[in-house]
Regions:
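Short, intrinsically disordered terminal tails adjacent to the first/last structured region
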Residues: 1-13, 253-266
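Hydrophobic alpha-helical transmembrane segments
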Residues: 94-109, 184-192
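Interfacial helix-loop-helix junctions of multi-pass membrane proteins
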Residues: 144-149, 175-179, 214-240
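Hydrophobic transmembrane alpha-helices
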Residues: 192-196, 237-245
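Aromatic-anchored segments of alpha-helical transmembrane domains
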Residues: 37, 41, 130-138, 210-220
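Alpha-helical transmembrane segments of integral membrane proteins
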Residues: 19, 23, 27, 31, ...
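Membrane-interface loops
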Residues: 50-61, 112-204, 251-265
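N-terminal transmembrane-helix/juxtamembrane module of multi-pass inner/ER membrane proteins
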Residues: 2-102
Length: 266
């Protein structure tokens, strides 16, 4: 009896620490590392030894022209709001980098370990949206507003923190011409919705609902995206959601039934 009790306790502890087992955790990490590798390869193919730069700048000029045409080139106004407070500047600059690494990573790990039944849909939604975004980067490389100081746009991060997409340790993960669509905007919406749904406390749900609009403000006010980039990111998110849901429903319908466990008592 003591051996069986100890075994059951060990099993419950293992399930709590690794709800899907060590093999699945290694698989999930490998999956994301593989995506980063594909991202880097696709970026290298699209760059063509630097030839993408003039194309990206021209595409950005088209974005500026469109926003001007509809009288909605308001990113500079957001920058003025940001510059009204040094605290706001520091928060926005930190948010821009932490959102795609620390916050996104935390959300994935939290759902994986604490709400594991929701993880697959969350992961697939993120990955599909990022794959669509990656195709967008390759087909429509677009420069961010900060690369047009002649038009009055500021590179807030370079001015106040010195950290830019070309900084050491950052350049390996940042594509300076990946403004369209904004994956910051897309990922923030996915994370915000997913975390708001799985969190139980009201204050946590409210904070996660506020996460997407804060990110949208941040990426525009720091000069990293136009609002049209953010809109494209939101549309990518909305396009990916029904595909993921359809795949999830198909998987649930075709999932093999779990064998029932019969307990025989003496």
């Amino acid at each position: 009896m003591p051996d069986s009790t100890a075994s059951a306790t060990t099993r419950r502890t293992s399930e709590r620490l690794l709800p899907r087992g060590l093999g699945d955790l290694v698989f999930q990490i490998s999956l994301w590392l593989g995506f980063v590798l594909v991202y880097r390869l696709a970026w290298g193919i699209a760059d063509h030894g630097g030839a993408v730069t003039p194309v990206a700048r021209e595409n950005a000029r088209h974005v500026i022209a469109f926003e001007n045409h509809v009288n909605a080139l308001f990113e500079q106004s957001l920058q003025k709001v940001l510059l009204s407070s040094r605290l706001l500047v520091d928060l926005a600059a930190a948010t821009y980098w932490l959102s795609q690494f620390v916050v996104l990573g935390f959300a994935l790990l939290w759902v994986y370990f604490r709400q594991t039944e929701s993880f697959t849909r969350f992961r697939n939604w993120l990955m599909l949206a990022n794959v669509i975004g990656l195709v967008g980067f390759v087909l429509i490389p677009t420069a961010p507003p900060r690369m047009f100081p002649n038009l009055g746009f500021l590179d807030i991060e370079a001015l106040f923190s010195g950290l830019t997409a070309s900084s050491k340790g950052v350049g390996a993960f940042a594509n300076p011409y990946a403004a369209m669509p904004s994956l910051h905007a897309a990922d923030a919406l996915i994370v915000g919705i997913s975390m708001a749904l799985v969190c139980r406390r009201l204050w946590a749900k409210v904070l996660w609902c506020l996460w997407p609009p804060w990110i949208w403000f941040t990426v525009m006010a720091t000069g990293n995206h136009f609002w049209l980039d953010c809109l494209a990111g939101v549309l990518v998110t909305l396009a990916a959601a029904p595909i993921v849901d359809a795949r999830f429903r198909f998987w649930r319908r075709n999932k093999p039934a779990q064998p029932k466990t019969v307990v025989v008592r003496d």
